[in-house]
């Protein structure tokens, strides 16, 4: 990626969106400039780094400070138009020179600690991912030369509070944010980074020994599992709109059972073979309902009413009024069939189940008895 391509906006639905840079780039730049300040013994207010994707970033330095053989500097995180929990916060680096010839990297205040296996970092270590570790160490080495050593501490005073708005606690990263970024650049509306974070939670569940997983679109699904199924939510992973991707990831990781749990407004799309459920990809909710109601012998009047609905909830009211609530069991079976069709070339296919529930947390339908599914999940 060239500097020009970094400055060029990302177009999404007709809007020009600005790129940003990761916490990893911030930490790298802060460490580099702190190392340079120790060596030169004067404050520096701007620093440049080359990101793993080849982009050169020229960043403003905040809170520079030198005290003997130690210096501190901060870079303010800018996510561009892809605003996340870390946007606008300061990422600090403290660099202390020594004669060891080695560079040691630690996480201080506001940087999370790894407490679970599955994310590729040792238990008890700072949540500074592999790529940022490499770029930080390389930038400091470039600054101090081959003979000197340095102790580098990355810290973020707002980190513990900001981390509460992230997935970190679910990933077993406690006490602060993560220093992340494989490219160093934040691309607005990037599905890949979002998908990767969801997949990472799957990897952690599998590394903990779980072989059965419940995929839900969001928090409502997790609450239903806890309150209505009586199943430990340790087995629950959010799939968001990325149904097909998360199913394939679960298969790749060797889960033997996948249970899809959600409201018909999301899961009904799977019955039509739609495995990315965001409305900008596809809708077909009413068309799918109408088709399956017709297969069950519903009268034309009901089909017309459902076809004219704008929301799944409105359609569900008509379905209930006409006594066709059994469609939800039918749809759940169809969802499982579609999943197995998608996985037809997989050597070892998992057991697939689907459970549909209403917004008031009532079970609408499932491919087989929910009690039976719940019992298996508790094994």
Swiss-Prot record:
Work out whether the entry's keyword set contains Amino-acid biosynthesis.
no
One GO term (biological process): methylation
What superkingdom does the record give?
Bacteria
Pfam families (UniProt xref): CbiD
Keyword DNA-binding in the entry? The reply is: no
Q: Where are the membrane-spanning stretches?
A: none
* SUPFAM superfamilies cross-referenced by the UniProt entry: CbiD-like
Q: What reaction is this protein's catalytic activity?
A: Co-precorrin-5B + S-adenosyl-L-methionine = Co-precorrin-6A + S-adenosyl-L-homocysteine
Query: Which molecular function terms from Gene Ontology are attached?
Result: cobalt-precorrin-5B C1-methyltransferase activity
Under which pathway is this protein filed?
Cofactor biosynthesis; adenosylcobalamin biosynthesis; cob(II)yrinate a,c-diamide from sirohydrochlorin (anaerobic route): step 6/10
Q: What's in the keyword line of the UniProt record? A: Cobalamin biosynthesis, Methyltransferase, S-adenosyl-L-methionine, Transferase
What sort of enzyme, by top EC class, is this?
transferase
EC number(s) given by UniProt: 2.1.1.195
The protein's matches in NCBIfam families, at most eight in alphabetical order, are given as: cbiD
Name the family: Belongs to the CbiD family.
Per its record, how is this protein called by name?
Cobalt-precorrin-5B C(1)-methyltransferase
The organism named in the record is Salmonella heidelberg (strain SL476)
């Amino acid at each position: 990626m060239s500097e020009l391509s970094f400055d060029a906006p990302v177009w999404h639905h007709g809007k020009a969106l600005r790129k940003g840079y990761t916490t990893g780039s911030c930490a790298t730049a802060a460490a580099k400039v702190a190392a340079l300040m120790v060596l030169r013994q004067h404050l520096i207010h701007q620093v440049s780094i080359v990101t793993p994707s080849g982009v050169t970033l020229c960043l403003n330095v905040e809170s520079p400070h030198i005290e003997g053989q130690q210096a501190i500097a901060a870079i303010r995180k800018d996510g561009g138009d892809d605003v996340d929990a870390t946007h606008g916060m300061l990422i600090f680096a403290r660099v202390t020179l020594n004669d060891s010839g080695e560079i040691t990297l630690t996480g201080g205040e506001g940087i999370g600690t790894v407490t679970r296996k599955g994310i590729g970092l040792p238990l008890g270590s700072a949540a500074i991912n592999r790529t940022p570790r490499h770029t930080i160490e390389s930038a400091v080495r470039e600054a101090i030369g081959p003979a000197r050593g340095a102790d580098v501490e990355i810290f973020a005073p707002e980190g513990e509070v900001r981390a509460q708005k992230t997935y970190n606690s679910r990933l077993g990263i406690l006490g602060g944010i993560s220093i992340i970024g494989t490219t160093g650049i934040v691309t607005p509306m990037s599905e890949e980074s979002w998908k990767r974070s969801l997949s990472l939670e799957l990897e952690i569940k599998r590394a903990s020994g779980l072989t059965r997983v419940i995929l839900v679109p969001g928090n409502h699904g997790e609450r239903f599992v806890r309150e209505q199924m009586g199943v430990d939510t340790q087995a629950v992973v959010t799939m968001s709109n990325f149904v097909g991707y998360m199913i394939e990831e679960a298969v790749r990781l060797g889960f033997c059972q996948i249970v899809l749990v959600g409201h018909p407004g999301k899961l009904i799309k799977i019955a039509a073979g739609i495995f990315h459920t965001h409305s900008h990809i596809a809708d077909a909710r009413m068309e799918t309902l109408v088709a399956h109601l017709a297969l069950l012998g519903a009268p034309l009047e009901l089909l017309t009413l459902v076809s004219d609905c704008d929301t799944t909830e409105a359609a569900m009211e008509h379905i209930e009024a006409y006594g066709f609530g059994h469609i939800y069991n039918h749809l759940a079976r169809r969802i499982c069939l579609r999943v197995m069709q998608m996985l037809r070339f997989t050597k070892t296919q998992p057991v697939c189940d689907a459970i549909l529930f209403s917004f008031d947390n009532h079970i609408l339908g499932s491919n087989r008895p929910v009690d039976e599914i719940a019992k298996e999940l508790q094994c």
